[in-house]
Design a protein with these regions (language model features):
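Bacterial Sec-dependent N-terminal signal peptides
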Residues: 1-8
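C-terminal motif of bacterial Sec signal peptides marking the signal peptidase cleavage site
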Residues: 19-22
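Bacterial signal peptide processing site
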Residues: 24-26
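Short, well-ordered beta-strand elements
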Residues: 30-40, 91-95, 118-121, 167-168
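N-terminal lobe/hinge region of extracytoplasmic solute-binding protein
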Residues: 37-87
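Sec-exported extracytoplasmic/periplasmic mature domains
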Residues: 67, 71, 88, 98-101, ...
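Aromatic- and charge-enriched surface segment that lines or borders ligand/interaction sites
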Residues: 81-134
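Gly/Pro-rich hinge or "lid" segments in bacterial periplasmic/extracellular proteins
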Residues: 164, 171-213
Length: 213
């Protein structure tokens, strides 16, 4: 998504802590390159399953969620261009911006970002028992049952791709602050075909080609 930034970040994020410390006092950037010095290496690039700061800081420079915080801390649309909330406060419907693309680490266009990618992302989080699931497992309808094994059909979980560019979450109870949770990597999109192709190598920390951007 933010491919122009990530092409510089991918290599930096994978350098050792020692190397970073050694060069922390020196930096050079061109007018088209974004540089950032990390304090520690991410153990994984799987932004869905990891809730650690190194992964979050590295990957969110290249991958977007539905909403994001501006420099003043206000929630603003990112991949979502608009949203609505049902009168009972239980259903959030997001319109996904058309034209948002997935890119490989080489900057090659891979696919459109669609509503289905957000469904795939949450299913990946649930199946992998992501560390941050506690943030949403009691929020999204049916998710706690899926995690406990009481329900084995993910289609019963309250996240649906109504069409390619319409995503819907159904909550167990009203949460006025729900939109803030969409900024967590846990609820970011994942391309299903890419995830299947990579298998266990998805998000491998030493391989910038292991995720899309």
């Amino acid at each position: 998504m933010k491919k122009s930034k990530w092409l510089a970040l991918a290599g930096v994020a994978l350098l050792s802590v020692g190397a970073l410390a050694a060069c922390s006092s020196k930096s050079s950037t061109s007018g088209t390159t974004y540089g950032y010095i990390y304090n520690s290496d991410p153990e994984t690039l799987d932004y869905i399953t990891s809730n650690t700061e190194p992964t979050t800081v590295a990957v969110t420079n290249g991958v977007d969620g539905l909403m994001e915080s501006d420099k003043y801390g206000n929630l603003v649309p990112s991949v979502a261009e608009d949203w609505s909330v049902s009168q009972d406060g239980l259903t959030y419907t997001y319109k996904i911006r058309k034209g948002v693309k997935w890119y490989t680490s080489d900057g090659e266009e891979y696919a459109d970002v669609t509503a289905k990618d957000f469904v795939t992302g949450l299913k990946h989080a649930a199946d992998a028992k992501a560390g941050a699931l506690y943030l949403v497992q009691d929020s999204i309808a049916g998710l706690s049952d899926y995690l406990s094994g009481a329900n084995k059909d993910f289609s019963n979980v309250g996240v649906k791709a109504i069409d390619d560019y319409t995503l819907q979450y159904t909550l167990k109870k009203p949460e006025p602050y729900w939109n803030s949770k969409t900024t967590y990597g846990l609820l970011f999109p994942v391309n299903e075909d890419f995830l299947k192709n990579k298998g266990k190598d998805f998000g491998k920390s030493t391989d910038p080609t292991s995720i899309l951007y």
